[in-house]
Structure formats: structure tokens, C-alpha cells
Amino acid sequence: MDESVTRRRALFLGGAAVGIAGCIGTDDGTESNDDGDGTGDGAPDGAGGGQDGSDDGTDAEVPLQNVPDSIALDTLVDGLQAPVGIEFSPDSERAYVLEQGGRILALDGSGSLLDSPVLDLREPIVAGGERGLLGLALHPEFASNRQAFVRYSAPSREGTPDGYDHTFVLASFEATEDGTSFRRESEQTILEIPEPQSNHNAGDLAFGPDGYLYVPVGDGGAGDDQGAGHVDDWYGEVAGGNGQDVTENLLGSLLRLDIDGGDPYAIPDDNPLVGEAGRDEHYAWGFRNPWRISFDAGGDGTDLYVADVGQSSYEEVNLVEAGGNYGWNVREGAHCFQTESCPSRTPDDVRGGEPLLDPVVEYPHSGGEVTGVSVIGGHVYRGAAIDGLGGVYVFGDFAPRGKLFASAPGEGGSTWPIRTIAIDGASVESLYAFGQDGEGECYALGSGANGGTVWRLGPAE
């Protein structure tokens, strides 16, 4: 292992498996959501049955009144290359860190990196921009079956149309008994999705409390849900439509797979489109770039948060339900996209006139007290280290020097209030991702003074 990697031993907590939350990547783990289209096209406020745009996250914040003004980010390890995810083993104190360039590294219970990568996929992947090694989830029965699931960007494979940029690959690997290696030769391809553009790849993986694997998929890239690889849909006011299509491809959606029930997978019987028109893998749709997802470890564990990166004006987090349509590209957040007005539901002949659901968390790129550039998701805090955070959704934004937020249901209205939390005791250039250990404590990943860094969230001094 490169000697420039710094080890921090006092901060590490062992724990159970975790979903990953994170950011928008490039070859160094950085990229904004501008898409380079330069249009600046935003959605006018107050149209299409959404929010009127008056809630900028500064309303009375009764559920957030005990949230601390600042949180410390304590360095666990640095000197990494674009860390975009962290996953905790359920059977040991080991944690696995994903580098977007293609390596999975392991931290032992003291916070020290193992000398060799657990898995090195730098050779077979396509990296750069928003591509690369993007997601990892350990099977709920990892302690006994040793199955790890990885998603990455690969050169175009058989079945990917000419002119497409790459192929999304979901694959399984078998871990050694001691968890220090994922056997390269054990790779089994679970799913391949042709990706027309280089961006909007989403990237996360997470097992739900039902034992099924949840897989967010971006809308196919470019800007505005348009360009090569995008299909026509029911909405004629804006071109493109992968986010609103559920029949032609799997783009712009959240998938739900039973990886134990078939070869390579089966469809859960209660997926919303089973027996209906559309691809059975779909669980929810209407997403642009759902970069990171997380389940709340509290209660029954079924609350599912999806952080969806916006186009030019709004960032959003959705509390997702089966069969939910989250609006893209009819709407960006709770606002009409590129039109003065827009419908609040699909036509009756499109899945019975389903509603376009508002996000629970939304903030603008400019013009509000709470602003950002690309939401990177987060977790509901269930730890004990930080007073006042219990039950609060803690998340971040890719803005320069990073932004840390807290949100929870407020008094009235469907959009939750947001509080900005100051970052104490760390030099942060960008935040890429969040993770959570089995004790409910949270971790941030990003770039700092010494390169790619994993921090543990703790109380400010």
C-alpha cells in the first residue's frame, strides 16, 4: 500500500452492514451537475401541483431544534483516490472503501488499511467523469455465503448499441473466509445495462430489510434527459423521456431484484409492474441521477431515501414508495422543468393517472439561505456520539469545501425544513459520499488536505 496513505487508529468503530451514500464523481471524484449544456434552464416556481417555491429550508424547525450548530469530521484515513463509498462487514470490524478508479480497500478494526486491495478492477473498468467503480453491497448473509455485489462501468459489451458510451455492470464476487480478498475469478455477471452517455450513472447498491437488492439507475446522461439513447414518452412538452418510460429500458429508475431466487436474479412478486405494462425490475421511476440511496436503520428499517441530482435549479431527496413516480423530466424537484405549467399526474391511460410525487427535501442552486450544486445523499443518524441528531437525516452537497445539512419532518407542508451544519476540525475540499456503521454512526468521504479522505462524524469541541 502507498506509504502516503495515512492511518488513524483511534476513531474506527466496527459494526454491521451499511448502505453507502455519496457524490458525483470524475477521474478524481469530482464533477458538478451542469452537464455542460449551459442553458441554465430552471423550473418556474409554483407549477404543476408542486410546492410554490417559498420553502427554502428556513421555516420553523421544531424537529431540528436540538441539532448542533457544528459537527467534527475526524480523520480515519487519508491519501486515498476518490473514495466514493464505505461498507461495513457484519461479521468483523472490517470496513471496505471504494475508490472510483477501481480498487476496493479494507480497513481493520483499528482503522489501518490492509497492505493489498481487496479487489482491483482498474483493468476492466472505464473510469473518468461519472464512470468507474461506483457501488458495493454485502449480502445480508455475508457472514455465511461470502457474497459481495459490485457495480462498475465497463467498455461496451455485447448487446450495447453502437455509439453508446459504456455498459453498466452489476456483478457478484466471493470473499475469502477472512474477508481480505474478493476472488477476481469468482465474478458472476448479474445485470448489464447499456449506457448511452458517460454521465448520470447513479451508482449505489443497497439491500433492503426485505432482503432484496435495490439498484438506482440514472436517466442515460447528457442534459435534460435528451440525446442519444433517450426515448419518447407520454409528455410532449419536453423532449426525451427515460425518466418517464418504464417499458423501453431500465434507465431513470430504481430497480428491485431478488438475487437469491433466480439465475442471475428473480423478480419479487410484489414489484409494482409485475403483471402490468413495463419492465418488472422497476420499483420506482422518474429519476434523473439518483446517486445515493439509504435505508433508515431505525424503526422497521423500511424508509428509503433517494438523493437525486438536479439539472440546473434544484436538488432533491425523495422518500420512496413502491410504484412512485418522482417526476423527472416533467419536473425538477417540485417545480415544472422548462415550462410555465405542467401536469401533477400522468394521463389516465398511463398507469391509471399516477401522481408525480414531491421530494421531502429540496433546495435551490441559488436564491435561498440553503443552496448547493449536487446533492450527495446521507443517512438517518442512529448513533450515540452526537447529541441532538437522533432520527435526523444528515446529508451533504458537492459544493466547494463541502456542505453538511440536517433535515427532518417539520410542522405542516410536505417539504421538510433544512439546517446547515458547520464542519469543525477538518480541511474539506469536497464531499463525495456518506456511510453508516452498525452502531448507527456516520462517516463522510471526500477530498481534503491530504487527498481522498474518510472522516468519522463526531461532536464538535
Protein language model regions, located:
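Acidic, Gly/Ser/Thr-rich repeat motifs that build Ca2+-stabilized beta-propeller blades
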Residues: G53-A222, F295, D303-V309, G368-E411, ...
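N-terminal Sec signal peptide cleavage junction
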Residues: G22-T26
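N-terminal secretory signal peptides and thylakoid transit peptides that target proteins
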Residues: M1-V18
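Ser/Thr/Gly/Pro-rich low-complexity, disordered linker/stalk segments of secreted
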Residues: T30-D59
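Repeat-solenoid scaffold signature
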Residues: R279-E316
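Beta-rich catalytic cores
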Residues: A82, G132, N201, L250, ...
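Short, conserved, GDST-rich strand-edge loop motifs in beta-rich repeat architectures
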Residues: A154-G163, P216-T247, Y314-E315
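Blade-edge beta-strand/turn elements of extracellular beta-propeller
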Residues: V62-D78, S112-G128, F173-P196, D232-R292, ...
